[in-house]
Amino acid sequence: MKKLSLFACLALLGAALLTAAHHESSPKAVASVHDLMEDVVKPNMDVLAAMKKRGGPQSEQDWKKSKSAASLIGEGAQLMLHPERVKDEAWTGGAEKSIEGAAAVMAAAEKQDTEAWMAGLTMTGQGCRTCHK
């Protein structure tokens, strides 16, 4: 009986370890880098660039829209760091800078701080220009 209990415990432990190992692996990339850039990052950068031309967000709705756009840019940049997408250190550095800039834009939008918003947007653009010269 003790051997059976020990065997059952070991079997459960093995199953738990296999399940944990499966969950720790990275999910597969679904969209291509081009799709992410064209469908997620670029349209949202266009929204922020248009606001920048007007001197920054001008209304409560603009501030909300800029926060939303920055969040999608930041998340898109996070997706660029997926192991199947990383090309080199410059790629990683550019994505990380874009994430940091997008987070700064979001924080500035929360405070409705135009100067900080512009600085965050500049940082986001610098991250993008790491690859897009």
Model-derived regions, located:
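Sequence context surrounding c-type heme c attachment/ligation sites in exported
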Residues: 5, 19-133
